[in-house]
A protein has these predicted regions:
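Non-catalytic interfacial helical region
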Residues: 2-98
């Protein structure tokens, strides 16, 4: 499942993220959750891709949250690669925030 959060108020975006992840964790057991923020100094888009593509060792469901808060950080995202991977992975809950 892919969910998109769009908004300029960081607090509201993070509140919605929490609500979505809480709902997923309530529905599924032992969820692995990964958080990525493009604004982080050491952000590496490859880690986002790796979190989406990597199969869980114990078959645990996964949630990947990826937040591009500022337009200036969009150049760090390989949109084509993300689109290809997302369209082929149905076993990962992906939350994209812009």
């Amino acid at each position: 499942m892919i969910q998109i959060i769009y908004g300029q108020d960081r607090f509201l975006v993070l509140e919605k993220r929490k609500a979505l992840i809480d709902a997923i964790q309530k529905e599924k057991q032992d969820v692995e959750t990964f958080y990525f923020y493009a604004s982080d100094h050491e952000f590496n888009f490859g880690q986002v891709i790796e979190a989406i593509e990597t199969v869980s060792l114990f078959g645990a469901p996964r949630v990947v949250f990826f937040y591009v808060e500022q337009e200036k950080d969009l150049h760090l995202v390989d949109i084509d690669r993300l689109e290809k991977i997302v369209s082929s992975r149905l076993d990962v809950d992906l939350i994209l925030a812009f």
